[in-house]
Amino acid sequence: MNNQCKTIAHVLRVNNGQELHVWETPPKENVPFKNNTILIASGFARRMDHFAGLAEYLSENGFHVFRYDSLHHVGLSSGSIDEFTMTTGKNSLCTVYHWLQTKGTQNIGLIAASLSARVAYEVISDLELSFLITAVGVVNLRDTLEKALGFDYLSLPIDELPNDLDFEGHKLGSEVFVRDCFEHHWDTLDSTLDKVANTSVPLIAFTANNDDWVKQEEVYDMLAHIRTGHCKLYSLLGSSHDLGENLVVLRNFYQSVTKAAIAMDGGSLEIDVDFIEPDFEQLTIATVNERRLKAEIESRTPEMA
């Protein structure tokens, strides 16, 4: 087995010299190439290397895959997470999407998890996507934040907010994040419904039956508001909001999303399709190689140390 790292690193210069890091995983040789290129938007507090396994599954099945780390987030891109806002997440996604277009990439399918799914719903009618796949996607940001943080901080006046919000062990700058939520209408379920109602982009949403942060009935509600009806919901049985909580859950996530991508690449919402599964050694090699690549990039960038 070839142990060489296949991941290709790119750096986009944005916002007066800030760096937005993008990784590319070409499709495997000797498999039929798919019609669409896949762009993966990682969930909150997840780096793009956390999705090495999913990229490997998709690549094994003929997809060209790109991932990125948002600005002001965990990972390789510029900025610190205490300045992260939902609008920053949106701008990062759109920057990578438009960069792919300038490279001549015409058919782009987006896969977005957790908080990044809310960003995807925001832009679904603005970007010319072939399809959208979301996993444990946030539809009611205020409710999810209350579940995750243990308190509805968005109910407080700005001057009564704590300095930071501890979200999955990371310190969000409370004032900048909350102001952005209200100023750009990220916070409510209704704001999500308004954004998706008129989309013509085919959508598959995966919920997790043990997810305490996202209500499945609200995801149903969102899909019911899509006027074309070109959407479908599937459940990841046995999973919580943490798709990497154990290897069984993680494998089910990889398999399900890969099958959804194959189906949607062929114009279908039915994910009962054949697919190629990479072996465990292959996944391990890809993961180790990407950790080395990440460490090498960080060692060349003093501010990341």
From Swiss-Prot:
EC number of the protein: 2.3.1.-
One GO BP: fatty acid metabolic process
Keywords: Acyltransferase, Luminescence, Transferase
A GO molecular-function annotation: acyltransferase activity, transferring groups other than amino-acyl groups
Keyword Lipid metabolism: no
Active site: 114, 211, 241
Top-rank EC class of the record's enzyme: transferase
Any Pfam family hit: Acyl_transf_2
Pathway in which this enzyme or protein is active: Lipid metabolism; fatty acid reduction for biolumincescence
Presence of the UniProt keyword Acyltransferase in the record: yes
Function statement: Acyl transferase is part of the fatty acid reductase system required for aldehyde biosynthesis; it produces fatty acids for the luminescent reaction.
UniProt cross-references to NCBIfam families, sorted A to Z: PRK13604.1
Family as reported in the entry's similarity comment: Belongs to the LuxD family.
Protein name: Acyl transferase
Gene name as annotated: luxD
